[in-house]
Amino acid sequence: MIANVDLHIHSRFSGGTSKDMNVENILKYGKLKGLNIIGTGDCTHPDYLEEIKQYKDRELILTTEIEDKNRVHHLILLPSISKVEELREILKKYSKDIDKEGRPRVSIGGAELLEIVRDVGGLIGPAHCVPPDTLLILENGFKRIVDIKVGDKVLTHENRFKKVEKVYKRRYIGDIIKIKVRYFPEEIILTPEHPVYAIKTEKRCDGSHGICKFNCLTQYTNPSCKKRYRKYKREWIIAKDLKVGDVIVYPIPNRVRDIKYLSLDKYLSNIKREFCRSRIPEKIEVSEEFCRLVGYFLSEGYCFRDGIGFALGENEKKIIDDIEYLMKKIFNLKPKIRDDGRSEGIELKYYSRVLRDFFGDMFYCGDEKRAWNKALPNEFLYLPKNKQLQIFIGWWRGDKGVTTSEILMNQLRLISLRLGFIITFSKHVPKNPKIGDREVIKYHARWQGRVSILDEKIVDELKNEDIKLPKKDVRYGWIKGNYLYAPIIRIGREYYDGFVYNLEVEDDSSYVTVSGTLHNCFTPWTSLYKSFDSIYDCYNKKPDFVELGLSADTDMADMIPELRDLPFLSNSDAHSYHPHRLGREFNQIEVDYIGGIEDNFEQIKKAIKHNKIIANYGLDPKLGKYHLTACSKCHTRFKLEDAKKYNWKCPKCGGSIKKGVLSRVEELSDGKIEHPKFRPPYYKLIPLAEMISLTIGKGIFTKAVQSLWEEFIKKYGNEIEVLINADIDELSKIHPKVAETINLFRKGKIYIYPGGGGEYGKISFKPQKVEWYREEVTLDRWLKQ
């Protein structure tokens, strides 16, 4: 007989899983889906194992997922309850959370775990911690973790720069933790088990709101103050153990590298006219005055075809005079002043292509010379403090703490910390206005900064610049040595289905993001290839099977030569019993009969060992959020060669381009799709609820969709029967349009626009053509060809 089998799900004892995922519901909704044998998931959890014992004669098979020391996840099938208990006892000495976590971690590698599992008679194979947008501090600037490469030097918790030795990536489905830290606009977003460099704090001893800290004034007036802060220590704390009021420890780079002069030779050599060359000096001194001019350019400056300009308000007389003075002194240039009287704006325009090229190269981070691409050269992050203060003063005078450049925002915050204060930025996302019936899309957020004092020494200098300081002398955080101590003000959780990343860093085993300090921690089936060059490097021998995961099908997996002689399993990895989750991927397996958990293990084992997997059913990989290489901001799709050409920076909006799973598979492949003779067909599925939703134009959780789904199930017993076997004419009696959608699906005429850059693929009735990025041909580019 042929059984529909889903071997990989999770119970309520795993993070990010529905609290209703108990054995009774798993069996009930598995039957409605059309599953004949279902993996229990999480069978190593002691409370869940006791629950499973009550259902040992039902259509279940004992399964669990375990994460090893390399953060590779393994799907494990076990023969009996006694063998689960035996495995638990062996793994207790390698695991701290096997008694409390449904998906435990162990301190051994895949090879050791394989031997242990096989010793108890089980089967094992690879299954499917920071999200990809996380921005890190590098020696040469900032970079998103998705773009980090081996050899890059990142800032560590020891306040030094160390090389990245490995980059890990895995698909993660479950809860992620979002930690909001005072002074930082970006939350720290990470998996619950990821260690964070922090301090566990205690409450104030006088009973008032707040934490005990070394800069608390009460200690000087309250004789009974216990000064509990003296016991504080910096340590690595698991993210899920942090609480509001605990303090994040953030290293402040203290390196100083002065720059005396900048050469303009390469820009001058492009100018043919001697007169133009003679006006501009061949090198300029990087003085405090030049740094203040840089600040003005970052706030008010721009490049145009024939030079640079500054756009100011007519009430900014002091700034206008200062810019004119600085440009004359440094570059020997006078402006053409544009003041047409029709607005309150004044433009200072300096006609010099030398300066256009110089400022364009130095103070932008992309091809487009626009406000949202402005940035400081990385070398300027280590200038002496007196020069960095002038950059800040020029920028603040011009824009009063506002920027649309995320990179510049992070650079200025880092500079402010070096100076003894911090610019706290708040993010303002523009609404999309309309012109008539047409919506105008705005991609660029605005960052509004305000100054918070952390070091008394800087106060007078800021006051002299009329910079608005907080009215009350309330200092929630503090700087001590070369570290900022910033309290956590909010912690939340959110369901996440996508890729997460992690780094292995030499010596210090840590890295600093723009909002926190994280430890090495980590894994999808692609993640194994991030941790190892080969599946055999992980296990030292062949595993029993490979789980495809939601982002791959057999065509993609068989592009990798070493996988071609291994059985493939397609499972749902469901975290809830909803029919569009449970059984969304499953296997058709030939078995002699369906019994209890012990009999079912023997049947599945025999099928895996003797090529009795009849078919794999799963989602079309195009539906995945990261199938194609695409921009994470505007979701423009890129061909791999174009993404590399633009250095993984979107030329359209300045966002980060993320490498797609398909691109990664192609890198690992030998260029062929070769299926072995025993490989069963892979059938692409779309859950019934999603097809109903597409047909009637209602959300998947709406009453209308749910009612129709129940009608189909009431007549046919389960969803798989509806999708694969039911007669279309009979389906039409329930709902003709949904029946037509199912018919189109069976004929392969439901189309998908592939996902990418964090955007899910979209199903459609119409054929979809991928809109790849195409470089706009401007007159300037055409002339350069």
UniProtKB/Swiss-Prot annotation:
Alphabetically ordered keywords of this record: Autocatalytic cleavage, Protein splicing
Molecular function terms from GO: endonuclease activity
PTM notes: This protein undergoes a protein self splicing that involves a post-translational excision of the intervening region (intein) followed by peptide ligation.
Disulfide pattern: none
Domain DOD-type homing endonuclease: 293-421
Superkingdom of the organism of origin: Archaea
One BP term from GO: intein-mediated protein splicing
SUPFAM superfamilies tied to this protein: Hedgehog/intein (Hint) domain, PHP domain-like
Annotated protein name in UniProt: Uncharacterized protein MJ0043
